[in-house]
Amino acid sequence: MAKSVREKIKLVSSAGTGHFYTTSKNKRTQTTKLEFKKYDPVVRQHVIYKEAKIK
């Protein structure tokens, strides 16, 4: 069975609320850490979400 190229990651809110999104990324093409501006429902604002590993 072939090893998956995509890696599951967690996007953690920089607002410190503990809210996160899960997604996947291609390990070969995306070598840098991902950063997105997404909606945080806890603070009701768009904040920066940074990549973290799923434990």
From Swiss-Prot:
PROSITE patterns: RIBOSOMAL_L33 (PS00582). Keywords: Ribonucleoprotein, Ribosomal protein. SUPFAM superfamilies: Zn-binding ribosomal proteins. One of its GO terms (cellular component) is cytosolic large ribosomal subunit. GO terms for biological process: translation. It comes from the Bacteria. GO terms for molecular function: structural constituent of ribosome. Pfam families: Ribosomal_L33. InterPro entries: Ribosomal_bL33, Ribosomal_bL33_CS, Ribosomal_bL33_sf, Ribosomal_zn-bd. Belongs to the bacterial ribosomal protein bL33 family. This is Large ribosomal subunit protein bL33.
